[in-house]
């Protein structure tokens, strides 16, 4: 809010979009509203695994485009460490738990508001895909017991990403008439070095310097991965107003999403 020059009272919508929740009911967005004192805001949660942030941005952007609101907040705070177990009884259990061993805890937020006439900033294009045939590949069970831990098949997640994400990146770049030289940074979901290498470097042929990689510092912080990386890139001076950015998400489900935006 401070960076955007926005007062809490001016927020019209608050969307909380994390994997983790503070309570089952009510929506975490109400807790955020109370802590901010943003009592003019319509509050709700949006759950879409690690794609929560870009999905919430898409929804809020649609609210603004339709005239429902002028200004809103997308916020995520994920404590993924609670879904990690080191108590594995077999090689299979270890394999299914292995992706959780890079989980971190983190949070981020973004303000979206209607652009002024002549301003070319904001979301310029988006693409989303859902393939429910992969839903069993990455799961946190809805049970209150010592079995409520993240389990996944890393090879199947990578296969889904390689199957679906390249087409989304190409679709958004074509829609915007961007080539790789136009893009300042590509900010992917920070999931694993192997997926980044196979997807962006080998399949899409992207140069390494175009991929912003915060994984070594923060690990996989779920739906917070992209806002954390975006904020870090801004703080490091790697992005400035007017720069073109691709946000590229992949999540359990399997879900894929790409947003082309101008800072």
Report the location of each language-model feature:
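Conserved active-site "lid/cap" helical segment
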Residues: 1-12, 97, 140-184, 195-204, ...
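Short coil/turn connectors at secondary-structure junctions
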Residues: 8-12, 38-42, 66-72, 97-98, ...
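Short beta-strand segments
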Residues: 17, 47, 72-78, 112, ...
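Short glycine-enriched loops at secondary-structure junctions
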Residues: 19-22, 78, 129-132, 191-192
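Acidic-glycine-rich active-site phosphate/pyrophosphate-binding loop
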Residues: 23-37, 76-89, 139-143, 196-208
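Flexible, glycine-rich active-site loops centered on histidine and acidic residues
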Residues: 65-102
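Condensing-enzyme catalytic core mediating Claisen C-C bond formation in acyl metabolism
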Residues: 88-159, 163, 250, 262-263
């Amino acid at each position: 809010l401070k960076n955007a020059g926005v007062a809490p009272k001016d927020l019209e919508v608050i969307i909380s979009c994390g994997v983790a929740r503070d309570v089952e009911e009510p929506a975490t967005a109400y807790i955020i509203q109370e802590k901010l004192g943003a009592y003019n805001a319509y509050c709700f949660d949006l759950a879409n695994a690690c794609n929560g942030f870009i999905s919430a941005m898409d929804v809020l952007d649609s609210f603004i485009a339709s005239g429902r609101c002028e200004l809103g907040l997308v916020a995520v705070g994920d404590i993924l460490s609670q879904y990690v177990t080191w108590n594995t009884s077999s090689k299979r259990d270890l394999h299914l738990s292995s992706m959780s061993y890079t989980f971190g805890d983190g949070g981020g937020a973004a303000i979206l508001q209607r652009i002024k006439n002549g301003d070319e900033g904001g979301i310029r294009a988006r693409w989303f895909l859902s393939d429910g045939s992969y839903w069993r590949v990455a799961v946190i069970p809805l049970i209150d017991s010592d079995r409520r831990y993240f389990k996944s098949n890393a090879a199947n997640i990578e296969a889904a990403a390689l199957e679906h994400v390249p087409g989304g990146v190409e679709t958004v770049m074509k829609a915007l008439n961007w080539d790789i030289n136009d893009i300042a940074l590509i900010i992917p979901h920070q999931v694993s070095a192997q997926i980044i290498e196979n997807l962006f470097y080998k399949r899409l042929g992207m140069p390494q310097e175009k991929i912003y990689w915060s994984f070594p510092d923060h690990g996989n912080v779920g739906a917070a991965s992209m806002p954390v990386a975006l904020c870090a890139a801004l703080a490091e001076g790697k992005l400035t107003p007017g720069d073109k950015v691709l946000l590229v998400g992949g999540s359990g489900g399997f879900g894929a999403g790409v947003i082309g935006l101008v800072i």
